[in-house]
Amino acid sequence: MYGGVLLGKFAAVMDTELKERLDSLVTKYNIPEFAENDPVQFPKRYSDGRDIEISALLTSTISWGRRPMILANAEKLHGILGHEPLRFVLEGDIEAIGEDNIHRTFFGRHLRFYLRGLREIYTRYGSLEAFAHHISSAKDDAPAWHLAEELNKVLHSANQNAKFDGPSRCLPDDCRNTALKRFNMALRWLVRNDGVVDMGVWSEFKPAMLYIPLDVHSANTSRALGLLTRKQNDRKAVEELTFKLREFNPDDPAVYDFALFGAGVRGS
């Protein structure tokens, strides 16, 4: 009995110390300078929430690999969209987008695939947030996975009559068990409003509902800190880590994404 009490007290002390360490890392990395070298800089260029949504989705889609390459190719992507992504989605000549490479294995045909689906969503619902409201994603325990599955349905429906070669490269065809790192990152940008990095243009979703955008850096850091035991970087790992971080900050667990990613990249 006494051993259990002592272990409980020890665990509480360890959690308190770990929370303090994580909070200090948030203070260190959740700063404007961090955003200057992060893909979030692209949706932050816009003021209209719908432009921000589109930029966030497309930028996050190509956010894998080396950071300098991501930023350079996101610039190329936004060169196609122009100064008003919403206008391009609704009125632009999607079929005129060529077969040029945009980012690694993401080519013009993959962008066309995504834009056809977005045109259907914005024509019918007016915004991605309104689409999310229509499918009740904000009431789901795992909004990212629910929204991704429904978005996938629209993407494939909108491309039924389009000649398409290869996988979509936009979202996994089966989202149920994947980490959805890039999609969760886009939701972090759209839902959180910290006045520093994230824009928080969505009102129906709450930061408490967000899940950590898990990548190799944040996963390795989380394991080193004892926050994550699962070895695979999949949905179960995202859930395990997020549930633990909710103990530290139930209203905004994704705030620790800055700490985990920054510490992992810089070896702090």
Name what the model sees in each region.
Residues 6-268:
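HhH-family (HhH-GPD) DNA N-glycosylase catalytic core used in base-excision repair
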